[in-house]
């Protein structure tokens, strides 16, 4: 992998290795940020709020009464099952073919695109905003988990056997830092919006 980077970028092998390791770690930064803010902390609460505004405590989905928590669980399950079905094929590709980076890029773009499109939910009617968020989240989560197959397959190419633990630990550290910082930013934005909403004068009707 580092040889390919060196050839394509014109860098020395040592510089290419440092660049590849840095990219590997920064990817974990972004992946952990998604998992922390989108999967765990912010988006579930946003979906639940919008679902409550549109349907009340429960809504009739395909003839079944569901809560927001149930729908969120189904969304995660659909994404996980989708990746589980294709993971064996992805694993074969990752192990036997030198196209890991191509698939990693494609699936990362899918995940990043789905995440970006979450921001367009406020442009829709309140009754369909939560539906948009769920659909985009499923695509984003499929991209994240699918890309993870190829991301994990890159570690053996990042360095020698005695370097892999240090590289993996460094990537984890980047991930924790990135996830934590973005969560703080998002929580700060939520608190700021709450304060602005509270401070707005009540309009007489």
Question: Over which residues does each language-model region extend?
Answer:
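Cytoplasmic membrane-interface "Motif A"-like loop-to-helix N-cap segments
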Residues: 94-110
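C-terminal ends and interior cores of transmembrane alpha-helices
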Residues: 108-127
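Hydrophobic core of transmembrane alpha-helices in multi-pass small-molecule transporters
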Residues: 114, 128-147
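Glycine-rich segments within core transmembrane alpha-helices of 12-TM secondary carriers
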Residues: 168-190
């Amino acid at each position: 992998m580092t040889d390919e980077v060196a050839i394509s970028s014109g860098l020395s092998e040592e510089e290419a290795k440092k660049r590849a390791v840095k990219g590997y770690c920064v990817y974990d930064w972004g992946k952990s940020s998604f998992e922390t803010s989108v999967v765990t902390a912010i988006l579930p609460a946003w979906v639940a709020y919008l679902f409550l505004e549109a349907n009340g405590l429960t809504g009739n989905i395909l003839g079944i009464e569901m809560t927001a928590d149930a729908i969120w669980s189904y969304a995660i399950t659909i994404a996980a099952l989708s990746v589980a079905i294709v993971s064996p094929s992805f694993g074969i590709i990752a192990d036997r073919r030198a196209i890991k980076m191509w698939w990693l890029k494609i699936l990362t773009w899918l995940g990043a695109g789905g995440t970006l499109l979450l921001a367009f939910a406020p442009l829709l009617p309140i009754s369909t905003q939560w539906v948009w968020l769920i659909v985009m989240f499923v695509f984003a989560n499929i991209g994240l988990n699918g890309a993870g197959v190829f991301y994990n397959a890159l570690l053996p190419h990042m360095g020698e056997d005695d370097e892999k633990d240090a590289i993996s630990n460094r990537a984890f550290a980047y991930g924790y830092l990135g996830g934590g910082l973005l969560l703080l930013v998002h929580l700060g934005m939520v608190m700021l919006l709450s304060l602005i909403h509270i401070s707005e004068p009540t309009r007489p009707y």
